[in-house]
């Protein structure tokens, strides 16, 4: 049983963590967002699974391109980095009813449900000052289905970038 749970956790972690439901963003109001035209990825960050890292980068790239930012690995205006973390959470679920026959003891069951909560963080740093200028954070319960996690990731990125202060669609 324990091996089955560990295997399920491993599948969830490698299949695709995280992404969606609760999304928050924060930005530096003094940052010169209007002057940012190019970006580059900071190497060595993102998801623990290379497939997910590729999907995540492609999804962020598409959103940045739609906002008018272009990739420039030599002299970018901003650096982009992502972080993915997971945490196991357990909930105790009790069910039953209070009285048995002749007002005796009740019947009930208790079970433990294990979830994997994931967090996706997207950070932007000004290339000149090296200061963080924008952060988007999404948290959700991961699924054991990679396609569901990809949907959650894209939904979270849509919510994040709806509040991104660069581009024609930006809402500040």
Predicted regions and their residues:
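Positively charged n-region of N-terminal signal peptides that target proteins for export
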Residues: 1-7
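Secondary-structure boundary/capping motif
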Residues: 36-40, 71, 132, 139
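Short helix-to-loop capping/linker segments positioned immediately adjacent to catalytic or ligand/cofactor-binding
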Residues: 66-71, 145
């Amino acid at each position: 049983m324990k091996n089955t749970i560990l295997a399920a956790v491993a599948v969830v972690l490698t299949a695709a963590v995280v992404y969606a439901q609760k999304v928050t963003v924060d930005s530096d109001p003094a940052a010169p967002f209007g002057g940012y035209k190019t970006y580059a990825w900071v190497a060595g960050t993102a998801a623990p699974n290379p497939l997910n890292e590729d999907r995540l980068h492609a999804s962020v790239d598409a959103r940045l391109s739609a906002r008018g930012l272009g990739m420039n690995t030599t002299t970018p205006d901003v650096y982009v980095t992502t972080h993915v973390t997971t945490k196991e959470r357990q909930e105790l679920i009790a069910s039953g009813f209070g009285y048995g026959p002749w007002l005796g003891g009740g019947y009930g069951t208790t079970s433990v449900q294990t979830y994997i909560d994931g967090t996706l963080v997207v950070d932007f740093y000004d290339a000149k000052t090296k200061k963080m200028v924008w952060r988007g954070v999404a948290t959700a319960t991961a699924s054991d289905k990679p396609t569901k996690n990809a949907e959650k990731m894209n939904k979270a990125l849509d919510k994040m970038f709806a509040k991104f202060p660069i581009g024609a669609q930006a809402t500040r």
